Amino acid sequence: NEGFRDIDEKLLRILHHRSFLDDCTRIFRAIRYSERLGFIIESQTKVLLKEGIKEICNVSGTRISSELIRICYEPERVSMFQTLDSFGILKVIHPEMAFPEDLKKVSQVVDIENWDKTEISCLLLFSSNPEYREVIARSLHMSKGVLVALSGLKVLENLEENISNADIYQHLISVPEAAL
């Protein structure tokens, strides 16, 4: 049976040629499962996956956001985002969306599996162009909490280097914890 052979050879293969076109969120799942299980996406499946990428723009922001957040909770999240980036998927989601560079650094020092969706969403958007973070968050239908945290992030980024502790306190008192 071809399915058992694929498992033995650690190949991920779709069942029919329209699979990614019928539901292009399967692209995210294919990448997630291939990285999680150490499988290689079979060559014809990869061709069809690439063809399906252009359809991602027809998927609701909520579904895309949900898939990206699921990836953030995976142990292999960095390699999964590298794969998304290498296929150009992040740029299809939004031209200013960038690979979350800080994901690897943060993952090494903090257990982000326990973070809530607002914190994960902010981390996801942190490496994107600051001028477009809110636009990206809105296009992905992220929560109001994410939008508030992103505005707090702007406050943090605009802090001057040589500032007194009292001034730092005044600036940070209203910044949501997720932005910190």
Which residue ranges define each predicted feature?
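Acidic, glycine- and histidine-enriched catalytic cores of nucleic acid- and nucleotide-handling enzymes
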Residues: 1-44
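Flexible, glycine/proline-enriched loop segments at strand-loop-helix junctions
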Residues: 14-19, 36, 55-58, 67-71
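Conserved, hydrophobic alpha-helical core segments of structured domains
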Residues: 57-180
